[in-house]
Amino acid sequence: MPVEYDPKTGLINLHNDQISYVIQILAHRYPVHRYFGRYFSKQPYFEPMPSGSHAFANDPTERFPYSVTSLPLEYSTIGSGDYRQPAYVIKDANNQLLPILEYTGFSVNDQPINSRQLPPTVSKHTPVTTLVIHLTDAVTKLQMDLNYTIFENQPLILRSTTLRHHGTTNLQVTALSSAQLDLPTDQYTALTLSGTHAHEANPSFNRLHPGLQTVRSLRGTSGPQHQPFMALAEPNTTELAGTVIGCALAWSGNFDSTVEVDQYQHSRLTIGLEPDTFEWQLKPNSSFQTPEAVLTWTNTGFNGMSQVFHDFSYQLMPSQTNIPSVLNTWETLTFAVSESKVQHLIEHAHQLGLQMLVLDDGWFVNRNGENGQLGDWFVDPIKFPNGLNPLAQQAHHHRMKFGLWVEPEMITTNSQLYQQHPDWVLQYVDRTPITARHQLVLDLSQAAVRDHLITTLTNLVQNNQLDYLKWDMNRHLTQVGSTHLPAAQQGELYHRYVCGLYDILTRLKRACPKLIIENCSAGGGRFDFGMLPYTNQTWISDLTDPVDRATIENGFSYLFPPRIFSNHITASPNAQNGRITPFETRLQLACIGQLGLELNPKQLAPSEQQLLRGALIKYQQLKSTFIKAHFYRLPTTRHVVAWLIVTADKKQAICCYLNGLNSRVKTQHPLPLHYLDAELAYSDSSGNRYTGHQLNTMGIPLKPTNADFTSQLIYLCQN
């Protein structure tokens, strides 16, 4: 039984055979946090909770001889004596703060939350148990459920909060986290991922200190600046070893992840909706569900944490078995696309062995630059006088797929759609609209807007025989107001926008179940666990230089398996940073993910074309074998990155490493692989034989290099 309850002590042990999460119901009143870590096979003994009698603490009462000022509460607020970061702030009809809600019981079931408006986080084949702790406010008749869904076979817990209002007056919710985790020490290093456009997912490691450390987004999306994620690692944790608590949010909008160290060197981690841009009017007989936080514990270092998040991603996402290699038109043609040019590219792609042609930006009316028209999605009759169907048919004739770039959330004022429905955009009353990239944003909270987009996109896909859409979003939200919401509910719009996006993607997938959708927001600007259930792969950055992109992949791999990264071979010198790199490096790095080409095939030398053809054949042969393989970051100071990809049975592996600047000193330094089966014997492509123990500890010999930015892919298999 994954939930054990001791009524004498009030202890609830939520567990599988890997982790335990222990809550105590203190004095039949408040749930407090007692433990999160390795599984307890027997119910542990915990020292009695201290009363917390100290300066500035609330006076204890006979019913509750404790002070909430320092209690490790499961879910708390301000105004009742707890002065730390609140998990929730709710006001009643008198504009007064609700207190810390009191325990009324718990329930257990074998179903996930999987709210219809939020991303589904548990597949129907994944066994889970959900513990629900029920809290209530007797005055307002508000019921609050703290949800804990534990996976049977993973050290993973999903946490969320559900509000159910049984009272008679409106409540105003101004902060509502998905999870709060109170820990008894401050001896942690916080890992976060930060960045910007074309420089995403840079790991930051910072020791906790007194006060607040926060990452957040105010942009309307999760954004490239910060990931909705924070990990707390014990001292001396490495990629290979050490204790880590990882916490991410399955949400694609504004978020807040904060850790606070109080005056007693206790830590509180909260993650959830960003409170400055969130309000919700909770009406009588209504409910509200937060996004889910994804919580894990491991004692096998950052790689161990990543394995849990990767496995979570795989069960979350649509199937990847049908994802084709692609030729994308963007860096070849930009906006200057035409029927004849695309026809030639389809033929070249077929000759090289690529499996799909993607027609990027510029295919629709009045779109010859960034200031062109958005919103109507009509094929440009000048560039494509015969429409897109002949191109789709040409691709399908070669057993290739055909796809388009779209930016459905955006609109320009010169579009027919805007002329007909100016009230469909996000806007403030009596204010001049603020454009970014010459664009306004559609109000996805409106049902009419969503219905229009579903009809438009479904017709676009079906009428043009499309197999794929690259769904882009190239600006963030401003003037987040709606003509269709009353003044008292305008604070709900950031949240309603994201739920509207999920609704559109859900309905589009239902209407076009075989459609491949690539997630993009000027690269990795909306890459989160909220988008994964709706999309097959992600364009992680607009920076295509293999050296910088490898570091971006390395950062994102803390959370996501690189198999879902869309990686394209582009020209050298690189269009974004001017770096010159060997073709082999660009090819090999692109193979660690969903492989594509984004240059004119005529620019490739015959030898490069031959390399690409051979790589595509090998890529397809190994794809099914490695589609859910384990990915590890290998510790190295001698390479830009070093990675190991190992099948579940550890009988096959791929080692990939990327060198930086070349050195005149040609000293060989083997690379330890750490994660192979020590009892197996392996061979590489050249026939060299090694034991797994040898490769794990001594390392694999690496070839000296005579050029900058070289790389190598080494395939290993059991003898």
Curated annotation (Swiss-Prot):
A Pfam family the protein falls into: Melibiase
Stated name of the protein: Alpha-galactosidase 2
Q: Which of the seven top EC classes does this enzyme belong to?
A: hydrolase
PROSITE patterns attached to this UniProt entry: ALPHA_GALACTOSIDASE
User: One biological process GO term for this chain?
Assistant: carbohydrate catabolic process
Q: Does the keyword Heme apply?
A: no
What is the native source organism of this protein?
Answer: Pediococcus pentosaceus
| Function as written in the Swiss-Prot or TrEMBL entry | Alpha-galactosidase associated with the sucrase operon.
Q: Which reaction does it catalyse?
A: Hydrolysis of terminal, non-reducing alpha-D-galactose residues in alpha-D-galactosides, including galactose oligosaccharides, galactomannans and galactolipids
What family is it from? Belongs to the glycosyl hydrolase 36 family.
Active-site residue numbers: D472, D542
> Record's CDD domains?
GH36 (cd14791)
Name the EC number(s). Answer: 3.2.1.22
Q: Which UniProt keywords apply?
A: Glycosidase, Hydrolase
Instruction: Give GO MF terms, alphabetically.
Output: alpha-galactosidase activity
Q: Which Gene3D superfamilies match?
A: Aldolase class I (3.20.20.70), alpha-galactosidase from lactobacil brevis (2.70.98.60), Golgi alpha-mannosidase II (2.60.40.1180)
